[in-house]
Amino acid sequence: MPIKNIATFFFLIFALSGCTSLYDTFVYQIDVTQGNYIEDEKLDQILLGMSQEQVIFILGSPMLIDQFDSSKWYYIRYIKPGGEPIQQDKVVFTFDNLLLTDIAREGTIDINPLIKTPKARNVPNAATEDPSTSDNPQTDNDTPVIVN
């Protein structure tokens, strides 16, 4: 009888160990990035009327070309940073006679959440502000640093 109780106890321990919510807090989860890296600078270079070859030269190959309508190209970027919510950015290019006619963008990615950017310094505008009243006073040897 005690062996049956011990076996039941271990069975319950192993069965209930799969029902834990500690997975998200204690287990390391890698950052997952898939798809095309869509930079605003490169997207600003795309103009209506460009050919498909010019778009490929600037942004690279699209993630998806619609099977039923080959005039639509999808550039999709998917990010899942660790245990945080999934973010997705999508840009759809529509072509007519091999020329770009429409650009549609939707998504939740503002900046790359996987890259930690340093805080930008407040550099006073010499024409409108007095440098001595800024957050970071400069001496004659300091050069203003602008962080992208």
Swiss-Prot record:
Membrane topology of this protein:
Lipid-anchor
Please, which domain of life does this record's source organism belong to?
Bacteria
- Spans annotated as Disordered: 120-148
Where does it sit, as one GO cellular component term?
Bam protein complex
Q: Where is the lipid attached (S-diacylglycerol cysteine)?
A: C19
Q: Which Pfam families match?
A: BamE (PF04355)
Question: Lipidation sites of kind N-palmitoyl cysteine?
Answer: C19
Q: Which UniProt keywords apply?
A: Cell outer membrane, Lipoprotein, Membrane, Palmitate, Signal
> Which GO annotations describe the biological process of this protein?
Gram-negative-bacterium-type cell outer membrane assembly; protein insertion into membrane
Location comes to:
Cell outer membrane
As given in the record, the signal peptide range reads 1-18
Role noted for this protein: Part of the outer membrane protein assembly complex, which is involved in assembly and insertion of beta-barrel proteins into the outer membrane.
Q: How does it assemble?
A: Part of the Bam complex.
For this chain, the family text in UniProt reads: Belongs to the BamE family.
Report what the protein is called: Outer membrane protein assembly factor BamE
Give the species this sequence originates from: Psychromonas ingrahamii (strain DSM 17664 / CCUG 51855 / 37)
